[in-house]
């Protein structure tokens, strides 16, 4: 158990060295000073908070490389869709031009 993380899970606004101080003399970490307006937590409470923290880890933002990879993938997809749309519109424009030319040819006679 990481004592600091367990305390911060229960008291997220607590400030280390102001609201509490931890110490380790070689026999494990313990709370040396407790200045929060709450009872000093028992070992059982600390372990419960630690277990809850393990079940519900705090949100970690995605890695910048992952974000860039997602953006690149979305841009590639959008580009492919635009290229297909451009091709379709180009084909339709060609058909319209041919229709106009054939209509002009009909009137020229």
Swiss-Prot record:
It comes from the Bacteria. SUPFAM superfamilies: XkdW-like (SSF159865). InterPro entries: Phage_SP-beta_YorD, XkdW-like_sf. Transmembrane segments: none annotated. Pfam families: XkdW (PF09636). To B.subtilis YqcC. This is Phage-like element PBSX protein XkdW. It comes from Bacillus subtilis (strain 168).
